[in-house]
Amino acid sequence: MQCFSFIKTMMILFNLLIFLCGAALLAVGIWVSIDGASFLKIFGPLSSSAMQFVNVGYFLIAAGVVVFALGFLGCYGAKTESKCALVTFFFILLLIFIAEVAAAVVALVYTTMAEHFLTLLVVPAIKKDYGSQEDFTQVWNTTMKGLKCCGFTNYTDFEDSPYFKENSAFPPFCCNDNVTNTANETCTKQKAHDQKVEGCFNQLLYDIRTNAVTVGGVAAGIGGLELAAMIVSMYLYCNLQ
C-alpha cells in the first residue's frame, strides 16, 4: 500500500510539472499569435526570421494543448484514481512514443531521399530570395555562421541569386578565411571553389553524428521517461479497486 501511495504521489508531481510546461507553451503561443510585435521586440531579428517559415504561435499552441492535456490526464487520473483518465493517458503517450520511433527510423533510412526533396525546395528559394528578402537572408546568414557552412549544398546554390547579381561574389561564409568577416578580399567563384566549404545539410548531419552520444542520450532519456510514465500509469490502473 505504501508503494502504491508513493508511486501515485510521484505520478501526480511529474504530471503537474508536465501540466505547467504545457500551460507555459500555450500562453507563449497565444502571446505570439495575438501580439507578435512585442514578441519580436524581446527576442530580436532571429525570431522574426524563424516566423518567416513556421508560424511559431500556432505551433506552440498545438504543442501546448497536447502537453497540457497529457499532464492534466496523468495528474487527474492519479489523484482521483480514474481508470478512464489513466488508460487515456497511457494510449496518448503510446501514440507519441510510436510517432517518435517512426520519425527516427524514417530519418535514418531516408536521409538521402530527404536531402533530394529538400534540395528541390530550398535551392530554388535561395536563388530567388537570398539578398532580396531580408528575413530569408538573415536566417541563412545565422545558419551559415553557426554551422560554418555555405548554402544548402555548396556555394553554387547562390549563383543567379539577387546577392550574387548585386555583388558579383558569394556570401563571405563560402570562403573559410571570410567566415569571421575579417578578410578584405571578396569571395569569388574561384576562391569559393578552392575553399570547398561544406553545405549546411551535410554539415548538420556531420554535427549530429559527431555528437551522436549526446543526441542519443537525450533521445534515450525522453524515451525512458515516456516508458516509465506508461508503466506507472498501467501499474496504477491495474492496482485500482
Swiss-Prot record:
| Entry's Gene Ontology cellular component terms | cell junction; cytoplasm; extracellular exosome; intracellular membrane-bounded organelle; lysosomal membrane; membrane; nucleoplasm; perinuclear region of cytoplasm
Q: Which SUPFAM superfamilies match?
A: Tetraspanin (SSF48652)
Result, substituting N154A: Loss of glycosylation
Biological process (GO) annotations held by this record are: protein stabilization
List the ranges whose topology is Extracellular: 33-52, 110-211
User: Quick check: keyword Transport in the entry?
Assistant: no
- Carbohydrate attachment sites? N141, N154, N178, N184
For this UniProt entry, which segments traverse the membrane?
12-32, 53-73, 89-109, 212-232
Q: Which family does it belong to?
A: Belongs to the tetraspanin (TM4SF) family.
Protein name as it appears in the record: Tetraspanin-1
Q: State the species of origin.
A: Homo sapiens (Human)
